[in-house]
UniProtKB/Swiss-Prot annotation:
SUPFAM superfamilies: beta and beta-prime subunits of DNA dependent RNA-polymerase. GO terms for biological process: DNA-templated transcription. This is DNA-directed RNA polymerase subunit beta. Coiled coil: none annotated. It catalyses: RNA(n) + a ribonucleoside 5'-triphosphate = RNA(n+1) + diphosphate. Belongs to the RNA polymerase beta chain family. The keyword Secreted does not apply. Transmembrane segments: none annotated. Keywords: Chloroplast, DNA-directed RNA polymerase, Nucleotidyltransferase, Plastid, Transcription, Transferase. The lineage of its organism: Eukaryota, Viridiplantae, Streptophyta, Embryophyta, Tracheophyta. The keyword Metal-binding does not apply.
Amino acid sequence: MLRNGNEGMSTIPGFSQIQFEGFCRFINQALAEELDKFPTIKDPDHEIAFQLFAKGYQLLEPSIKERDAVYESLTYSSELYVSARLIFGFDVQKQTISIGNIPIMNSLGTFIINGIYRIVINQILLSPGIYYRSELDHKGISIYTGTIISDWGGRSELAIDKKERIWARVSRKQKISILVLSSAMGSNLREILDNVSYPEIFLSFPNAKEKKRIESKEKAILEFYQQFACVGGDLVFSESLCEELQKKFFQQKCELGRIGRRNMNRRLNLDIPQNNTFLLPRDVLAATDHLIGMKFGTGILDDDDMNHLKNKRIRSVADLLQDQFGLALGRLQHAVQKTIRRVFIRQSKPTPQTLVTPTSTSILLITTYETFFGTYPLSQVFDQTNPLTQTVHGRKVSCLGPGGLTGRTASFRSRDIHPSHYGRICPIDTSEGINVGLTGSLAIHARIDHLWGSIESPFYEISAEKAKEKKERQVVYLSPNRDEYYMIAAGNSLSLNQGIQEEQVVPARYRQEFLTIAWEQIHVRSIFPFQYFSIGGSLIPFIEHNDANRALMSSNMQRQAVPLSRSEKCIVGTGLERQTALDSRVSIIAEREGKIISTDSHKILLSSSGKTISIPLVNHRRSNKNTCMHQKPRVPRGKSIKKGQILAEGAATVGGELALGKNVLVAYMPWEGYNFEDAVLISERLVYEDIYTSFHIRKYEIQTDTTSQGSAEKITKEIPHLEEHLLRNLDRNGVVRLGSWVETGDILVGKLTPQIASESSYIAEAGLLRAIFGLEVSTSKETSLKLPIGGRGRVIDVKWIQRDPLDIMVRVYILQKREIKVGDKVAGRHGNKGIISKILPRQDMPYLQDGTPVDMVFNPLGVPSRMNVGQIFESSLGLAGDLLKKHYRIAPFDERYEQEASRKLVFSELYEASKETKNPWVFEPEYPGKSRIFDGRTGDPFEQPVLIGKSYILKLIHQVDEKIHGRSTGPYSLVTQQPVRGRAKQGGQRVGEMEVWALEGFGVAHILQEILTYKSDHLIARQEILNATIWGKRIPNHEDPPESFRVLVRELRSLALELNHFLVSEKNFQVNREEV
């Protein structure tokens, strides 16, 4: 939080700052911490010792550029050099060696792994420490338990049973006496009794036999091992038994870590040093004391709130990368030990360089990281749909992943909004579906304390004395466990009269409760109305007038907006659009002042301080979501520029502001049922004037391989048995030409796969050709890359990547231009979404009193029940802004200045627009905001006045071209013989339970029978029915059962139930009855 000259003002922190801070901590601290833990590798037989030093490690600059890494499908990484020492007898060697490559974060806060942009999102987990809870059993008796959570996520429970004996549950099945556990950890009975507040309870439950088991540490360890590992018989104490117990129990369940030690000390009032990060007997005894106090009413009876953010911690990119680095160093240790043995077998003199070789040992580091980025649930493909998604993706927090919750098992309480989320995690922005409440987004002012993993939120200190004493502390960052002790005034309540503040009462938050208290009792207040929301929520104008569910949908749908060919910034915004676009890094900002020498579509040449700087531009590059990323220069040749000025704008930005959609004229009225149930009626103007036209880039790739016989596949244009028309776009190498227009079914890359002679089907004609002309039959199979359905477009790029002569990969990029069409999804910024149902000629659209036809018609019934009234304010203010040539940037909760502030603003602007344009219909006092409009087909006015306005409408990535699908025949499931599911597999349309009910309701028995049997899983009938349908013949009626019935019979047979079936008809019914 930076403060400028104006004392009350503050700037919003960089939105990608959290990712950068995390990675910097990994590079500067975490690497050294892990290298310090690397043990000295000793081989006593040969008097050899190998050691790595944390001091003075170096990371080289990446050997390739970002663009080249993406182009050649490589990992953007940096080589790590560390100091190593090898002691061999009396010979000591020191060298700086490379131990491998580490992926490097780029300016977007992402990593490039094998040419793909990936991002690591933050995980929110329960902090290590101890948590108490009480619950009632089936008899209504309170059961008190204390759960100890380790840094690894392992859990152990302390509980008191009905006989008042204290147990430690170390696994689901095994519980161990607390005395045995304490003794196994190194305490004798006297020390235990001296360190507890209730020694009589500890002495009451062990009998003579149990006391004998804990006489010494060795006996206690044997008893503990027998109970923990469920091992019977007589065990003998040994070092290997201790090591196994250490590995299986103490390491996983007793390592608290730095955060766990702090939490344990704080919860149990202990003063154990912070560097002692393991669970001690003293911790266990203090925890048991507290549990006894809760049981007998002498301790604090409050349960720990597991959902409070003070009991959670954030695992950022630094922690996750540090874990992987430690894992890689562990593998490196084993590899070095093997290499040492190999060196002595060969009887060669070792050096640090020979022990860590680039080919075998140091490759472990990069492979560990590539596996992590490829398989770890919190490593995701970077969402590049539009600039907003790029900014928001790195600010996600997830409860899912290793050590966290799962979508299937998480409770309602763990998903719900908690008072401690206020100003830290957005109460609105979360995913819909099974993961609702489990993935969230950080509030815009929140920051992560990387030392303790807590989320902090800024507040203004009200106390005048403190402000005078220490001015820089005017803004304080409070962690979740600190803000419970402060009276916090909400910044979005009605503003105070500056003159008589002391006499005012204000709503405030104290200890998770909302109170109304006097102003002088307030300690801190919110700094910004946006403080509680994420970026997505902060971009919704008039959010305070919307239902939270619709705001949630809006913040999600803004991330699905497709960049349009001609972007336009919103008339009504919130003021956060500029910073969102800036932090997405899609635009190019001048880093120094200078003069423009020249600009073109590929680069900008800038002269600064006597140097010529070339700034490359992104030119029609495919994003991870197949949208088009493109930068256009915005500075003319010869212009002098200043530092911070925009040189080139990216997709979906205008003038440095986010521009995801278009301002279009909308009317809220029904129209012939075409906007029933959220359907949207649009004008053909949006199609012909390319208002909602977007560009999409599809990638198609093919790779040559070596067959099982050792023959190599070949890329060529010479493909037999194919029409010349399909090969028309190929060059002499067999690859499609740049700039070609390709249609469905065209060949993009010609490829032949060799086959052995026995695989080729020799037909009679082949023998004749060989006998007459001496021609050999082709023994190759055509396996070319063909353009799939819906892939038509212009070839804009072809990449030929050849790692070795036999391994060739060809990638073809095709640009598609998509106008808006029936079936596309559009949405506003208030959760008002819909599908295009009809495109009307502009002359048939309803038109205003000045003759302007409306662009979109929404259903008015979509507003009252959804309670997203913000769209009404936005459309009316947008109309006024369009007529007055103004843009508005309105912070939320403007009712804090006066009652009905939003309504007053909208009406005053509409009235001004009406006066300026001399159009009285813009503001009619009887029905402000509404107007009489006319039917385009008849010219008659509609009966009721209609709300018209300019709304900012987005086109979403759910487009009909990627959804529409049909099938006659295709692949079938092997077991059920029913059509497979999904568009990608050319699957069929599912007729489910409810669809069957609908058909039953209409009594269409024959159609129902065809759908469920003949057309689906009747092997013989489905072949005949296709032929009968094509030729218009009668559909045959087969009497044998379909395949799914046979599957049912076989399943019953596997349960030892025999089911026989036979056909009963009019002819054989009498016979069968007599036989029976």
